[in-house]
Each structure stands twice: as C-alpha cells, then as structure tokens.
Amino acid sequence: MSRRGTAEEKTAKSDPIYRNRLVNMLVNRILKHGKKSLAYQILYRAMKKIQQKTETNPLSVLRQAIRGVTPDIAVKARRVGGSTHQVPIEIGSTQGKALAIRWLLGASRKRPGRNMAFKLSSELVDAAKGSGDAIRKKEETHRMAEANRAFAHFR
C-alpha cells in the first residue's frame, strides 16, 4: 500500500473580471502559444462588443450561446468485425460544454471579419439567437447520431 497521501482535486480557476468558470474555459481554448493575457484581451473585447450589440449582460449571452451549442449525443468510431461503425454515445455536461466551446471558437475563426474579438462576438450572438455555424455543427452531429441509431448496441 502506498504511503503517499491522496492528491487534492484541482478546481478550475475563475477569471478576474467575470468570476466565471465558463469564461476561464473559453480563455484557455482561445489561448495560443501561451499568450494568456492576449486571450483575455480578445475575450473581454468580444464581451464589450456583445454588450454594445445586444444591450444585455454579455455573460448571459455567453451562457445562452454555450447552452444552445452543447450537444446531448455524439458519434464515436468503433471498429467491429473489420468495419468501422459510427456509434452514438451520450455526452456528459462537462464534455458537452468543452465541445460547444471548441465548436464556437472554430466557427468564429472561420468567419470573415476584422479581428478575433469581432468574429467571436458575432458568433456568440448568433449562437444565442439559434443560428450560426456552431449551431449547424451541433445539428449535424445530432443528425449523424440519429442516422446511426442502429449501431447504438455496440456501446
């Protein structure tokens, strides 16, 4: 038996301004080459633009956007008897949020526009309204899962 103590579970830190874990998750996904201050700058500018566009709390728009993009089910490739099947699997809340954030950032990076803050704010507002590339990605994933429902027993 090991004599070492059990490791303490790390809790995700919240950001200095909004004190929100979702904001921190988003910043960590925006982050490139270790430039965290730049990632914070991009997100805060995007939040300011959301405030100007919608005249509502940008944090509630962010929550609504992530809630709208979060998938309930996804497909996972599973090799059975020499052929690969797309098997639908349920997704937990944390993994779903992580996927939603990844899709939102991917969609905003693909958008044409001036800078990342502008593109991110536009994508978040669109996702909160129920449109945009990230929402399309979620619907496509759900369609794939529905189409491959016959393989659900391979889980």
UniProtKB/Swiss-Prot annotation:
Pfam families hit by this protein: Ribosomal_S7 (PF00177)
Subcellular localization(s) per the UniProt record: Plastid, Chloroplast
Record key words, sorted: Chloroplast, Plastid, Ribonucleoprotein, Ribosomal protein, RNA-binding, rRNA-binding
GO cellular component: chloroplast; small ribosomal subunit
CDD domains the UniProt entry points to: uS7_Chloroplast
Broad class of the protein's primary localization: plastid
GO molecular function, one term: structural constituent of ribosome
Listed GO biological process terms: translation
InterPro entries given in the database record: Ribosomal_uS7 (IPR000235), Ribosomal_uS7_bac/org-type (IPR005717), Ribosomal_uS7_CS (IPR020606), Ribosomal_uS7_dom (IPR023798), Ribosomal_uS7_dom_sf (IPR036823)
Domain of life: Eukaryota
Keyword check for Transferase: no
Subunit structure: Part of the 30S ribosomal subunit.
Function: One of the primary rRNA binding proteins, it binds directly to 16S rRNA where it nucleates assembly of the head domain of the 30S subunit.
Protein family: Belongs to the universal ribosomal protein uS7 family.
Protein name, as recorded: Small ribosomal subunit protein uS7c
Organism name: Euonymus alatus (Burning bush)
Lineage: Eukaryota, Viridiplantae, Streptophyta, Embryophyta, Tracheophyta
Gene coding for it: rps7
